[in-house]
Amino acid sequence: MQHFLPDSESAFEEHPWNWHTPLESKALIIGTFPSALKNRKYNFFYPNPANFFWRIMSEVSDIPLLHFNGEKAVEERKEILSKLKLAVTDIGKTIVRYNGSSLDEKLEVQEFMDIFKILEENSTIEKIIFTSSSGKSSAVSWFLRYLTEKGIHHRFPKGNKPIRSEFIFNERKILLAILYSPSPRAANRITFEKLVEIYRNEILF
Protein backbone atom coordinates (compact mmCIF):
# COMPACT_ATOMS: atom_id res chain seq x y z
CA MET A 1 0.00 0.00 0.00
CA GLN A 2 1.34 3.46 -0.90
CA HIS A 3 0.23 6.85 0.41
CA PHE A 4 1.88 9.65 -1.52
CA LEU A 5 3.18 12.50 0.59
CA PRO A 6 2.98 16.19 -0.37
CA ASP A 7 6.45 15.80 -1.88
CA SER A 8 5.67 13.86 -5.07
CA GLU A 9 9.18 12.41 -4.97
CA SER A 10 8.38 10.31 -1.89
CA ALA A 11 5.85 7.63 -0.97
CA PHE A 12 4.81 5.97 2.28
CA GLU A 13 4.73 2.16 2.05
CA GLU A 14 3.63 -0.66 4.33
CA HIS A 15 5.35 -4.03 4.11
CA PRO A 16 3.25 -6.32 1.89
CA TRP A 17 4.15 -9.68 3.51
CA ASN A 18 5.50 -9.07 7.06
CA TRP A 19 7.31 -12.41 7.50
CA HIS A 20 7.42 -16.06 6.45
CA THR A 21 8.38 -18.70 9.02
CA PRO A 22 8.54 -22.34 7.91
CA LEU A 23 7.90 -25.02 10.53
CA GLU A 24 10.83 -25.49 12.93
CA SER A 25 12.85 -22.62 11.45
CA LYS A 26 16.38 -22.51 12.87
CA ALA A 27 17.50 -19.15 11.48
CA LEU A 28 15.86 -15.86 10.51
CA ILE A 29 17.11 -13.80 7.57
CA ILE A 30 16.49 -10.07 7.95
CA GLY A 31 16.68 -7.60 5.08
CA THR A 32 15.62 -3.95 4.91
CA PHE A 33 12.45 -3.64 2.78
CA PRO A 34 11.19 -5.01 -0.57
CA SER A 35 12.39 -3.39 -3.76
CA ALA A 36 10.23 -0.81 -5.54
CA LEU A 37 7.04 -2.25 -7.04
CA LYS A 38 8.28 -1.67 -10.58
CA ASN A 39 11.20 -4.04 -9.90
CA ARG A 40 9.17 -6.92 -8.40
CA LYS A 41 8.52 -10.06 -10.43
CA TYR A 42 6.45 -11.82 -7.75
CA ASN A 43 4.85 -11.10 -4.38
CA PHE A 44 7.46 -12.44 -1.98
CA PHE A 45 10.78 -11.53 -0.43
CA TYR A 46 13.70 -10.52 -2.67
CA PRO A 47 11.42 -10.15 -5.73
CA ASN A 48 13.98 -8.25 -7.82
CA PRO A 49 15.76 -10.72 -10.15
CA ALA A 50 18.87 -8.53 -10.11
CA ASN A 51 19.44 -9.56 -6.48
CA PHE A 52 21.49 -12.75 -5.99
CA PHE A 53 19.63 -13.88 -2.84
CA TRP A 54 17.57 -16.66 -4.42
CA ARG A 55 20.43 -17.85 -6.59
CA ILE A 56 22.44 -18.26 -3.38
CA MET A 57 19.58 -20.05 -1.60
CA SER A 58 19.15 -22.34 -4.60
CA GLU A 59 22.80 -23.37 -4.39
CA VAL A 60 22.66 -23.90 -0.62
CA SER A 61 19.45 -25.96 -0.79
CA ASP A 62 20.24 -27.87 -4.01
CA ILE A 63 16.81 -26.89 -5.32
CA PRO A 64 17.06 -25.40 -8.83
CA LEU A 65 15.24 -22.20 -9.69
CA LEU A 66 12.77 -22.91 -12.50
CA HIS A 67 10.24 -20.10 -12.08
CA PHE A 68 10.98 -16.38 -12.04
CA ASN A 69 7.60 -14.68 -11.89
CA GLY A 70 4.13 -15.22 -10.51
CA GLU A 71 2.80 -17.64 -7.91
CA LYS A 72 4.93 -20.58 -9.05
CA ALA A 73 8.05 -18.56 -8.25
CA VAL A 74 6.67 -17.84 -4.77
CA GLU A 75 5.92 -21.52 -4.07
CA GLU A 76 9.34 -22.54 -5.34
CA ARG A 77 11.06 -20.10 -3.00
CA LYS A 78 8.92 -21.18 -0.05
CA GLU A 79 10.01 -24.76 -0.75
CA ILE A 80 13.64 -23.65 -0.56
CA LEU A 81 13.05 -21.93 2.79
CA SER A 82 11.25 -24.98 4.18
CA LYS A 83 14.13 -27.28 3.25
CA LEU A 84 16.64 -24.90 4.85
CA LYS A 85 14.42 -24.31 7.93
CA LEU A 86 14.97 -20.63 7.22
CA ALA A 87 12.56 -17.84 8.15
CA VAL A 88 12.65 -14.49 6.36
CA THR A 89 11.49 -10.95 7.07
CA ASP A 90 12.55 -7.32 6.69
CA ILE A 91 13.26 -4.94 9.55
CA GLY A 92 11.19 -2.16 7.99
CA LYS A 93 7.42 -2.49 8.52
CA THR A 94 6.55 0.98 7.19
CA ILE A 95 8.94 3.24 5.30
CA VAL A 96 9.14 6.33 3.14
CA ARG A 97 10.66 5.60 -0.28
CA TYR A 98 12.29 8.47 -2.16
CA ASN A 99 12.38 8.84 -5.94
CA GLY A 100 10.86 5.38 -6.44
CA SER A 101 14.27 3.89 -5.73
CA SER A 102 15.08 0.37 -4.52
CA LEU A 103 18.34 1.52 -2.91
CA ASP A 104 18.47 1.22 0.89
CA GLU A 105 19.79 4.76 1.24
CA LYS A 106 16.60 6.02 -0.42
CA LEU A 107 14.47 4.45 2.33
CA GLU A 108 13.51 6.05 5.63
CA VAL A 109 12.07 3.68 8.23
CA GLN A 110 8.92 4.80 10.05
CA GLU A 111 8.03 1.64 11.99
CA PHE A 112 10.02 -1.51 12.65
CA MET A 113 8.87 -5.08 12.08
CA ASP A 114 8.09 -6.87 15.35
CA ILE A 115 11.16 -9.10 15.43
CA PHE A 116 10.57 -10.09 19.05
CA LYS A 117 7.10 -11.37 18.13
CA ILE A 118 8.66 -13.56 15.45
CA LEU A 119 11.10 -14.97 18.02
CA GLU A 120 8.30 -15.51 20.55
CA GLU A 121 6.17 -17.39 18.02
CA ASN A 122 9.09 -19.47 16.73
CA SER A 123 11.03 -20.89 19.66
CA THR A 124 13.27 -22.97 17.38
CA ILE A 125 14.98 -19.90 15.87
CA GLU A 126 18.54 -19.75 17.18
CA LYS A 127 20.18 -17.27 14.81
CA ILE A 128 19.45 -14.00 13.01
CA ILE A 129 21.30 -13.37 9.74
CA PHE A 130 21.54 -9.86 8.26
CA THR A 131 21.91 -9.22 4.54
CA SER A 132 23.00 -5.58 4.75
CA SER A 133 25.06 -3.50 7.15
CA SER A 134 26.37 -0.44 5.32
CA GLY A 135 25.08 3.02 6.19
CA LYS A 136 22.19 4.30 8.26
CA SER A 137 19.57 2.58 6.09
CA SER A 138 20.66 -1.03 6.51
CA ALA A 139 19.18 -4.11 8.16
CA VAL A 140 21.81 -3.97 10.90
CA SER A 141 21.45 -0.24 11.59
CA TRP A 142 17.67 -0.47 11.78
CA PHE A 143 17.84 -3.61 13.95
CA LEU A 144 20.10 -1.85 16.45
CA ARG A 145 17.61 1.02 16.58
CA TYR A 146 14.82 -1.52 17.13
CA LEU A 147 16.77 -3.09 20.02
CA THR A 148 17.34 0.35 21.54
CA GLU A 149 13.57 0.99 21.45
CA LYS A 150 13.20 -2.29 23.37
CA GLY A 151 15.72 -1.19 25.99
CA ILE A 152 18.59 -3.33 24.68
CA HIS A 153 21.85 -1.61 23.76
CA HIS A 154 23.99 -3.77 21.50
CA ARG A 155 27.19 -3.22 19.54
CA PHE A 156 28.69 -5.52 16.97
CA PRO A 157 32.45 -6.17 16.98
CA LYS A 158 34.45 -4.71 14.12
CA GLY A 159 36.17 -6.93 11.60
CA ASN A 160 35.74 -8.81 8.37
CA LYS A 161 32.46 -10.45 7.45
CA PRO A 162 30.89 -12.64 8.57
CA ILE A 163 30.69 -10.62 11.79
CA ARG A 164 29.21 -12.62 14.65
CA SER A 165 27.64 -11.58 17.92
CA GLU A 166 24.76 -12.62 20.19
CA PHE A 167 22.14 -11.26 22.56
CA ILE A 168 19.77 -12.69 25.14
CA PHE A 169 16.03 -12.70 24.46
CA ASN A 170 13.71 -14.13 27.12
CA GLU A 171 16.57 -16.24 28.49
CA ARG A 172 17.33 -17.53 24.96
CA LYS A 173 20.72 -16.93 23.39
CA ILE A 174 20.17 -15.60 19.87
CA LEU A 175 23.21 -15.73 17.59
CA LEU A 176 23.72 -12.82 15.19
CA ALA A 177 25.64 -12.84 11.91
CA ILE A 178 26.28 -10.01 9.45
CA LEU A 179 26.98 -11.29 5.93
CA TYR A 180 27.82 -9.66 2.63
CA SER A 181 24.81 -8.23 0.85
CA PRO A 182 23.45 -10.33 -2.04
CA SER A 183 22.71 -7.15 -4.00
CA PRO A 184 24.55 -6.77 -7.32
CA ARG A 185 26.05 -3.46 -6.18
CA ALA A 186 27.78 -5.20 -3.25
CA ALA A 187 28.70 -8.31 -5.20
CA ASN A 188 31.76 -6.73 -6.80
CA ARG A 189 33.56 -7.12 -3.45
CA ILE A 190 33.30 -10.91 -3.39
CA THR A 191 32.81 -13.79 -5.83
CA PHE A 192 29.46 -15.53 -6.14
CA GLU A 193 31.08 -18.81 -5.08
CA LYS A 194 32.38 -17.21 -1.88
CA LEU A 195 28.95 -15.70 -1.19
CA VAL A 196 27.39 -19.16 -1.46
CA GLU A 197 30.03 -20.63 0.86
CA ILE A 198 29.48 -17.94 3.52
CA TYR A 199 25.69 -18.18 3.42
CA ARG A 200 25.84 -21.99 3.47
CA ASN A 201 28.05 -22.00 6.58
CA GLU A 202 25.75 -19.61 8.45
CA ILE A 203 22.46 -21.23 7.43
CA LEU A 204 23.48 -24.88 7.85
CA PHE A 205 24.99 -24.47 11.30
Pin down the residues of each PLM region.
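Residue-level signal for well-ordered alpha-helical scaffold segments within enzymatic catalytic domains
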Residues: 55-59, 117, 181
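Short, surface-exposed acidic-centric catalytic microdomains
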Residues: 38-107
